């Protein structure tokens, strides 16, 4: 049962109302449960035995009663959660019950799930007994923590330590909350100093960006600390700690801190089982500290061993992470490029999602069927993701029947209790039914959108209200799903009232009235989509869309050499394209379809494949341009008529490229969807690739001049914002500042520039062959930077370890001194080009431009892979000027 304790070591609460609960006095089953409560509270197994049916196995019942009616119980609560007819009995004569049982012993408690078979014992309709009983799950180690008001301590030179953090308090007042094995919570009052010194270089950069220094040092006035009693002595020490009489003023301050801070972590809200606050213990070696600083208000430090990135510093006021990384032990265990599925309990093999959405009320009713296969060595709980506003009505498994669940507060997570432990490879289905009010998703960081101007602008009278549309995608958690985004085929059915239409992940299958009698009110239409290929996540878009423009695109133009390199799998010779627009964008439909056809054909020629059989494009209106690209679906947002907003000062606004958003979003069908990323650090493998492929389309469709201006723009943003952190920080670039432009500058533009510089270093043939090898190897799987590096190394024969170490994992730029001189050799004019790097050595190729007196220019590319590189290049006469990186195709500082 230890696993159940681990997965619930967070703030959780019971999901939903008790199913099947009937507390009316006339209910004989409720009366029987009340008698069982009394028998357990009396710690009297014999009283339980007296409640058995004559058909019961008394030996197994006696063992059960001995375990449940343990000595010292101070409170017992039994709540019925489910009731079905008992096989072999007449209707109303017997039931199989699922019940939850809370057994308290003083300040400790145990939570159990039982299965009880009960039936009427004789002619008396109110006389029922227990036929059989089974203990399904147990959650031990619940504590009703209270501050010890009888003891106060004075400590000198008190120190709290954990990985990379140290809190020191010269003179401290200490109160504790204890378990039977010692204190687990400490309230520490007194002025002290906090030092947080993260080991990873990227985390130190983040601290410098946020606080101005790579080590965070800040005074604080008090802290609340949670530890496991067994390891408390190694985490909290003092030169001297003595008890003193309780000071009412100190106690009042301590109680205020305890009341405010204790409920934030490790807490259970047991709903109708108990109105009290219950807490789990941190795992041995873990630590949580709520630190009341003067500069940041409350900072939360956690060392949580059940997370891959187990060290976190969190700003409660801003609700943003300052630092998140793996401890030294976890780094050695999981590596830098860890897989986010590392600790997953299961993999989803198939989804069937059926929802009804009412745009006017924002009401969503849904049912998700998940076919899953366990991947953990053993499991008696499973966790799923579902938006907090959606109330779970039931979770049923054909294998186990109705299942009990608890919801993790404010984390969009539900923990499901299995009635038995299952081993690796076990297959089962979950059917999750839910409903609630759910707001649509804004365009977010797995999409592209420019930021609003820094000076707020109000809509003018000339602006026309936007055509409404509603997106539910990867951040909406609108369907029950695994905690991490895996790959699985799916079927989606979405029902909406007329005149609304739906575009969704998958190939369009049908639209028809829903089965059954027609409801009163607006007519309903049911849209069905099937994703035969595995997808990372599902999405749907609701709008008043025009009838689709449909075109079938042949994919037979792919070169034979590219077909030969494919891995085994399902591939398509043609693609069905569907374009739908808001009514005001109707005239754009033909243009969007033509552009989409050309872009898809171009990208397919580079990669050698389009991953899906169909693609739907939805053109919608937003105040600012942007887009989002789930599998099988690309949404392009355009400003509405009369929009006066300007967005030129944004990394996503590439110059002279009107098709940018469409090109970027379409590229995500390959990069981000067909090939995913292992964890959030690898986000550049989606956004950087999509950004660079969009630039390649600009080169193909608009020419080298536009491509060059795009490269210069991306280079300038990269140089300007590289000090915000390495590409490998992913979403956290700009996160604390709340400035998404920084994220796009580094992840989108610098990520794209890394690809451009890699292409120039290894050459076009090796670069695009590496792209195809990478795609073919990781099609419908999640990859990391090292996987891409190995693919390009295999095609180029070059060692690219340092290249990626500097450009992806580092946050510095090459500092290059460039000099040139002219000389003659054997009658030929030569330019001697010298590059000297100071600081860290980078690998790159750089353009050297020769400008002659007649204003003509020539150029050459020099590969710089050492601290000092000299190259001799023939020139025609005497150039009047020689420049390095005039085309700004290399990110760096050249002098």
Language-model region placement:
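Exposed beta-sheet edge and beta->alpha loop/turn motif
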Residues: 86-142
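Extended, low-hydrophobicity, Ser/Thr/Pro/Gly-biased non-transmembrane segments
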Residues: 221, 230-345, 431-548, 555, ...
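Hydrophobic alpha-helical and helix-loop surface patches within well-folded domains
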Residues: 529, 556-574, 579-834
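Short solvent-exposed beta->alpha transition segments
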Residues: 24-38, 45-107, 786-790, 794, ...
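Hydrophobic helix-coil surface modules that form long, contiguous segments used
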Residues: 329-335, 341-367, 373-378, 388, ...
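Bacterial N-terminal signal peptides
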Residues: 5-15
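Non-catalytic accessory/interaction domains
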Residues: 283-284, 290-332, 337, 343, ...
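A surface-exposed beta-strand-loop module
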Residues: 140-251, 257, 267, 306, ...
């Amino acid at each position: 049962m230890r696993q159940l304790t681990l997965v619930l070591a967070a703030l959780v609460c019971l999901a939903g109302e008790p199913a099947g609960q009937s507390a009316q006095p006339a209910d004989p089953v409720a009366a029987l449960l009340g008698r069982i409560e009394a028998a357990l509270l009396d710690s009297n197994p014999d009283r339980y035995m007296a409640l058995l049916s004559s058909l019961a196995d008394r030996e197994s019942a006696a063992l059960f009663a001995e375990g449940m009616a343990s000595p010292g119980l101070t409170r017992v609560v039994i709540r019925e959660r489910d009731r079905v007819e008992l096989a072999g009995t007449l209707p109303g004569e017997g039931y199989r019950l699922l019940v939850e049982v809370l057994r308290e012993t003083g300040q400790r408690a145990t939570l159990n799930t039982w299965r009880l078979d009960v039936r009427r014992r004789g002619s008396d309709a109110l006389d029922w007994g227990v036929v059989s009983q089974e203990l399904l799950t147990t959650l031990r180690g619940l504590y009703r923590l209270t501050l010890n008001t009888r003891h106060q301590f004075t400590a000198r030179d008190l120190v709290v330590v954990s990985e990379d953090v140290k809190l020191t308090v010269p003179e401290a007042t200490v109160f504790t909350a204890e378990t039977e094995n010692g204190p687990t919570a400490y309230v520490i009052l007194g002025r002290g100093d906090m030092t947080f010194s993260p080991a990873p270089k990227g985390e130190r950069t983040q601290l410098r960006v946020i606080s101005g220094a790579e080590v965070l040092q800040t005074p604080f006035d008090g802290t609340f600390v949670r530890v496991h009693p067994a390891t408390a002595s190694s985490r909290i020490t003092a030169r001297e700690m003595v008890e003193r009489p309780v000071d009412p003023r100190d106690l009042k301050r301590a109680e205020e801190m305890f009341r405010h801070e204790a409920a934030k972590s490790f807490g259970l809200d047991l709903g109708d089982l108990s109105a009290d606050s219950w807490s789990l213990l941190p795992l041995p070696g873990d630590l949580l500290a709520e630190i009341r600083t003067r500069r940041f208000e409350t900072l939360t430090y956690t060392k949580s061993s059940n997370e891959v990135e187990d060290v976190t510093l969190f700003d409660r006021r801003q609700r943003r992470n300052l630092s998140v990384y793996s401890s030294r032990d976890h780094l050695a265990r999981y590596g830098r490029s860890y897989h986010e599925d590392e600790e997953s309990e299961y993999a989803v093999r198939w989804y069937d999602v059926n929802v009804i959405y009412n745009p006017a009320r924002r009401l969503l009713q849904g049912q998700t069927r998940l076919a899953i296969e366990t991947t953990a060595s053993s499991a008696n709980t499973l966790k799923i993701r579902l938006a907090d506003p959606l109330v779970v009505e039931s979770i049923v498994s054909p294998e186990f029947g109705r299942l009990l669940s608890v919801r993790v507060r404010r984390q969009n997570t539900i923990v499901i209790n299995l009635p038995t432990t299952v081993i690796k490879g076990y297959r089962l289905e979950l059917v999750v039914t839910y409903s609630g009010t759910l707001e649509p998703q804004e365009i977010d960081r797995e999409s592209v959108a420019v930021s609003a101007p820094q000076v707020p602008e109000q809509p003018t009278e000339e602006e026309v209200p936007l055509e409404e549309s509603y997106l539910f995608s990867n951040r909406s958690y609108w369907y029950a799903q695994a905690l991490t985004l895996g790959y699985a085929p799916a079927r989606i059915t979405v029902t909406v009232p007329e005149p609304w239409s739906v575009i969704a992940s998958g190939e369009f299958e049908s639209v028809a009235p829903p089965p059954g009698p027609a409801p009163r009110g607006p007519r309903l239409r049911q849209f069905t989509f099937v994703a035969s290929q595995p997808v990372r996540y599902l999405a749907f878009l609701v709008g008043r869309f025009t009838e689709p423009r449909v075109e079938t695109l042949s994919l037979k133009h792919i070169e034979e050499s590219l077909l030969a390199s494919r891995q085994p799998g399902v591939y398509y010779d043609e693609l069905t394209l569907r374009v739908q627009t808001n009514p005001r964008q109707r005239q754009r439909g033909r243009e969007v379809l033509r552009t989409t056809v050309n872009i898809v054909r171009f990208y397919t020629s580079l990669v050698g494949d389009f991953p899906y059989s169909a693609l739907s494009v939805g053109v919608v209106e937003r105040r600012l341009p942007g887009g989002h690209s789930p599998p099988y679906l690309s949404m392009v947002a355009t400003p509405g008529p009369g929009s006066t907003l300007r967005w030129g000062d944004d990394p996503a606004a590439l110059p002279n490229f009107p098709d940018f958003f469409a090109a970027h979003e379409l590229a995500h069908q390959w990069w981000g969807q067909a090939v995913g990323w292992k964890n959030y650090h690898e986000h550049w493998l989606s956004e950087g690739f999509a950004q660079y492929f969009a630039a390649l389309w600009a080169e193909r469709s608009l020419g080298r001049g536009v491509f060059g201006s795009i490269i210069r723009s991306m280079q300038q943003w990269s140089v300007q914002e590289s000090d915000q952190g390495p590409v490998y920080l992913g979403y956290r670039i700009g996160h604390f500042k709340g400035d998404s432009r920084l994220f796009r500058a580094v992840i989108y533009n610098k990520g794209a520039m890394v690809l451009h510089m890699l292409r120039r270093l290894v050459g076009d043939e090796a670069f695009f062959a590496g792209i195809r090898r990478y795609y073919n190897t990781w099609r419908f799987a999640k990859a990391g930077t090292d996987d891409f590096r190995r693919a390009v190394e295999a095609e180029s024969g070059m060692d690219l370890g340092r290249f990626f170490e500097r450009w992806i994992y580092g946050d510095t730029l090459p500092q290059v001194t460039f000099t040139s001189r002219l000389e003659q050799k054997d009658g030929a004019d030569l330019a001697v080009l010298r590059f000297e790097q100071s600081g860290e050595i980078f690998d790159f190729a750089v353009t050297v431009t020769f400008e002659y007196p007649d204003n003509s220019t020539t150029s050459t590319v020099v590969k710089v892979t050492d601290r000092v590189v000299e190259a001799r290049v023939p020139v025609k006469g005497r150039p009047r000027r020689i420049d390095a990186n005039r085309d700004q195709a290399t990110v760096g500082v050249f002098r």
